[in-house]
């Protein structure tokens, strides 16, 4: 039983996209990454509109014969500060999530473990680790390593008695 390709697959194949030959699991993974980014972008747009509206509603526009050099007496600085902190936090969180999800979508990362692997490979981690393993070890490091291996093997210094104590 062969599944007939969808209209989307036909379009991808027609324009020679690599995604046309990708597995369904890979497509779902990329779709999830895209939806996370688009969702955070939508939240960013919503919070920026909310911040804009709250700024415009607090704007002081004096009437014709009022001076514009003094703010009105019925002004609550505490609530204004609370709204400013709240909208600033919302904007910072939504923009940060958009940047994080966008970066993860670009470098094809879905969780923290994959992020660690990707960063290690991008920074040459495996090659540098092999180079460090080939270097000779100094005396202090060798002594420390042997001591730790003895402790892990269950060999302790107080188990061995010296000839002077006998």
Swiss-Prot record:
> GO terms for CC?
membrane; mitochondrion
| Transmembrane regions | 35-52, 81-103
Give the membrane topology: Multi-pass membrane protein
> What UniProt keywords apply to this chain's record, in alphabetical order?
Membrane, Transmembrane, Transmembrane helix
Origin superkingdom: Eukaryota
Location in the cell: Membrane
InterPro entries, sorted: AIM11
Family membership: Belongs to the AIM11 family.
Family annotation (PANTHER family) = ALTERED INHERITANCE OF MITOCHONDRIA PROTEIN 11 (PTHR39136:SF1)
This one is known as Altered inheritance of mitochondria protein 11
The organism's taxonomy opens as: Eukaryota, Fungi, Dikarya, Ascomycota, Saccharomycotina
């Amino acid at each position: 039983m062969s599944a007939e390709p969808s209209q989307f697959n036909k379009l991808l194949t027609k324009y020679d996209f690599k995604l046309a030959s990708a597995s369904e699991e890979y497509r779902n993974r990329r779709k999830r990454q895209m939806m996370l980014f688009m969702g955070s972008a939508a939240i960013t747009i919503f919070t920026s509109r909310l911040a804009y509206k709250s700024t415009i509603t607090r704007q002081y526009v004096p009437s014709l014969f009022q001076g514009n050099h003094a703010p009105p007496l019925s002004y609550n600085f505490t609530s204004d500060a609370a709204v400013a902190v709240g909208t600033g936090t919302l904007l910072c969180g939504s923009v940060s999530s958009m940047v994080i999800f966008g970066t993860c979508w670009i470098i094809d990362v879905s969780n923290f473990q994959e992020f660690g692997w990707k960063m290690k490979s991008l920074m040459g981690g495996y090659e540098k680790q092999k180079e460090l393993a080939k270097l000779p070890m100094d005396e202090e490091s060798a002594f420390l390593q042997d001591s730790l291996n003895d402790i892990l093997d269950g060999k302790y210094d107080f188990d061995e008695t010296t000839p002077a104590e006998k």
